[in-house]
Curated annotation (Swiss-Prot):
Alphabetized GO MF terms: dioxygenase activity; metal ion binding
Residues reported to bind 2-oxoglutarate: H264
Binding site for Fe(2+): H97, D99, H260
The protein's name: (3R)-3-[(carboxymethyl)amino]fatty acid oxygenase/decarboxylase
Required cofactor(s): Fe(2+)
Protein function: Involved in the biosynthesis of a unique class of isonitrile lipopeptides (INLPs) that seem to function as virulence factors in M.tuberculosis and to play a role in metal acquisition. Catalyzes the conversion of (3R)-3-[(carboxymethyl)amino]fatty acids to (3R)-3-isocyanyl-fatty acids through an oxidative decarboxylation mechanism, thereby generating the isonitrile group of INLPs.
Entry's family note: Belongs to the TfdA dioxygenase family.
Catalyzed reactions: a (3R)-3-[(carboxymethyl)amino]fatty acid + 2 2-oxoglutarate + 2 O2 = a (3R)-3-isocyanyl-fatty acid + 2 succinate + 3 CO2 + 2 H2O; a (3R)-3-[(carboxymethyl)amino]fatty acid + 2-oxoglutarate + O2 = a (3R)-3-{[carboxy(hydroxy)methyl]amino}fatty acid + succinate + CO2; a (3R)-3-{[carboxy(hydroxy)methyl]amino}fatty acid + 2-oxoglutarate + O2 = a (3R)-3-isocyanyl-fatty acid + succinate + 2 CO2 + 2 H2O
Native source organism of the sequence: Mycobacterium tuberculosis (strain ATCC 25618 / H37Rv)
Disulphide bond pairs: none
Length: 289
């Protein structure tokens, strides 16, 4: 199978993916396309759940989401997001985030399959954090070099149906055990491309410390957040890329370098998506101080 790429960079379109004949796609071929463009849309694929999983396994090691309530009923590898009652978990992703940023190792790839999309203007916003970092003047970059950031997902953890009537302290203790705050270098280096990435997120990154654990002025973090564009309520920052898609497309991106959030459209109706997240086996280094 020969994959054809139309366009360059964020939103490049890939054709030639036959869900019934995936064996000819090599891991290196599809990974290189993603590493190069960062965000690609595999057009008009319409895979079954099994075919979607098979493609994910070609790309990398699939890691199921840690909370079973998000799992597909027959395929736990698949994360289901849906506004249709009983078909998945609603209201996911309506804030800037990096998938699994709160886990011990940054995930390499995220891959989403839309099954139902209400209207033409529903989509996803993306920000290239490597491009942001490259654009910053030295005066903004220097205070972040060699520092460590704390990422805390706890305020976005959803209450599960099984948590109803449980003491809130008990639920909170479980959240702390399962998803405690985690520290990563403020600037990581992509293990494949070598690009430096400003690894921060407005909804998860709570503070920056120097290499000795001393707090860095909170204004440094605030200025970096503003520079990325994720604080722009109108989504007009030049760093924000808007990606639309259609049912049957597959949206695949480099999860180390791109942050994203849902773009809600003007039309009412059901939104249902499947998602896989994968590792690539490459260790993510921090900035070489």
């Amino acid at each position: 199978m020969t994959l054809k790429v139309k366009g360059e960079g964020l939103g490049a379109q890939v054709t030639g993916v036959d869900p019934k004949n995936l064996d000819d796609i090599t891991t290196d071929e599809i990974r290189d396309i993603v590493y190069t463009n960062k965000l690609v849309v595999l057009k008009d694929v319409h895979p079954s759940p099994r075919e979607f999983i098979k493609l994910g396994r070609i790309i990398g090691q699939i890691v199921p989401y840690y909370e079973p309530m998000y799992h597909h009923e027959d395929h736990p590898e698949i994360f289901v997001s849906s506004t249709e009652e009983g078909q998945g978990v609603p209201k996911t992703g309506a804030f800037w985030h990096i998938d699994y940023m709160f886990m011990p190792e940054p995930f390499a790839f995220s891959m989403v399959l839309p099954l139902a999309v209400p209207g033409h203007d529903r989509g996803t916003y993306f920000i290239d954090l490597a491009r942001v970092w490259q654009s910053l003047p030295a005066a903004k970059r220097d205070p972040a070099r060699g520092t460590v950031s704390t990422h805390d997902p706890r305020r976005h953890i959803k209450i599960r149906p099984s948590d109803v009537y449980r003491p809130i302290g008990e639920v909170w203790d479980e959240i702390n055990r399962t998803t405690p705050p985690i520290k990563w270098p403020t600037v990581i280096r992509h293990p494949k491309t070598g690009q430096e990435i400003l690894y921060i997120c407005a909804t998860g990154t709570t503070k920056i410390e120097d290499k000795d654990g001393n707090p860095v002025d909170p204004e440094v973090l605030q200025e970096l957040m503003a520079a990325t564009g994720q604080l722009d309520p109108e989504y007009q920052s030049p760093f924000i890329h808007t990606q639309h898609y259609q049912v049957g497309d597959i949206i695949l991106w480099d999860n180390r370098v791109l942050m994203h959030r849902a773009k809600h459209g003007s039309a009412a109706g059901t939104l249902t998506t499947y998602r896989l997240t994968m590792l690539d086996g490459l260790k993510t280094p921090g900035y070489a101080a």
